[in-house]
Structures are given as structure tokens and as C-alpha cells.
Amino acid sequence: MLKLKKDFIDTIDSVYLIKITDDLYSICEHRGNTFFEFFDVFFPDFNEERKIDLNETKILFTKSCAADRFKDFFVKEITSVIPNSRAIETIYLQPFYYLLKRLQNGGDVNQYVSSVKRTNIYKSVDYEIVIEQLNEQNNLQEIYKYNSFGMVGSADKIHEELSNYVKTGILWGREKSTLFPTISMEMLQNYILQTTNSL
């Protein structure tokens, strides 16, 4: 299948088929100008008659970035799927808030990651602090659940993260491994197991 050109990814609330590997596809929706939602739905190929309501489908994560960052693995627009109309996620990981605190405190603040709630989803500077300094032991739930607002580097990291999620059931990629290096796969497996058992 032909890949989309950059200019094709310009319609708000359009749904796209994305290719993760040669035999693994998923769905992404373009929301609110620069937002892209990735869903917990995967298949070896896509049948246009497949009935999917994204309002009833789990959102794995939301990214905000320019459309051309995804042009290499967006395959085509899908019109048979019901688009998601739920509110866009407002809570994200913020790995750079500590820099502001470092300036305010004269430079003696160690690096850490915060969680923030965006008060204006269209302006990256408008947010309030939810948890200023995430602790890898006490805040594993928040660390696992939320993601960074933007995307650094190529979309290959998302390919890899989604592919590994299908294989392992754990949604964890290079970005979080860098931000939280002491969180092991064993910790994540135990967390997923505990979460599943509590349902």
C-alpha cells in the first residue's frame, strides 16, 4: 500500500491505518491540530468492513507533534471506523520542569521528571503541576499511565513500543527507559499483574 504524503494528514478527527511491521497494523486518530491518539487495537491486515468504535477503544497514548513525523508509517485514511470524540488527554510527563526550579534555586536542583496537567491543551507552556517530582517506587502508576507531551527523535520509537506491547503486554519504550532507568521489566511485570488481579 502507498504511504501517505505529509499533506494528506491534515484533517482533524481523521482516522488512519498505521503499519507497525509487515504483519502488524493498528489505528491512529488525528485530534485537535497536532494531537495523535494511538489505540489498543491491532490486526495482521485491515478489512474495510471491520466495525470499530474508537469511543469504546482504549487509548494507549497521545502525542503532539507535526504530521510529517508520522508520514512513513501512516498507510491510508479509514472512513469505516467511528472516530473518538472523548476529551483529549491533559495529563503528561514533563521532564524539564526541574530546569525552571534549578534557575529559581541558583542551580542546585537534581534532575527529575514531573507530571503536569495542561490548562490550555493548545499551548505547551500553560500547565499546572500535579506531582512535582515523580518517585519511581511510589508513583509507578502515574509513570506507567502517562507519557511525554511531544516526541523527540523519529517515529521508529513508536513502532518499537507498539510492537513490544503486542508481544509482552507492557507499554514501555526507549523514552521512559531513559527517563526512569531504575524501573526494570520485572517491576513493570509485577505492576501489570497486580493491576490485572485487582480488576
Question: What residue spans do the PLM features occupy?
Answer:
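Context-gated lysine
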Residues: 3-6, 19, 51, 58, ...
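Long, low-complexity intrinsically disordered regions
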Residues: 62-130
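Short N-terminal edge-element motif at the start of the domain
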Residues: 1-62
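Glycine-rich, aromatic-bearing surface loops/beta-hairpins
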Residues: 122-199
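Intrinsically disordered, low-complexity segments enriched in small/polar residues
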Residues: 14, 23, 110, 120, ...
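Amphipathic alpha-helical interaction segments
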Residues: 47, 69, 105-106, 180, ...
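Acidic surface patches and DE-rich sequence motifs
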Residues: 20, 103, 135
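Intrinsically disordered, low-complexity regions
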Residues: 33-36, 57, 97-100, 110, ...
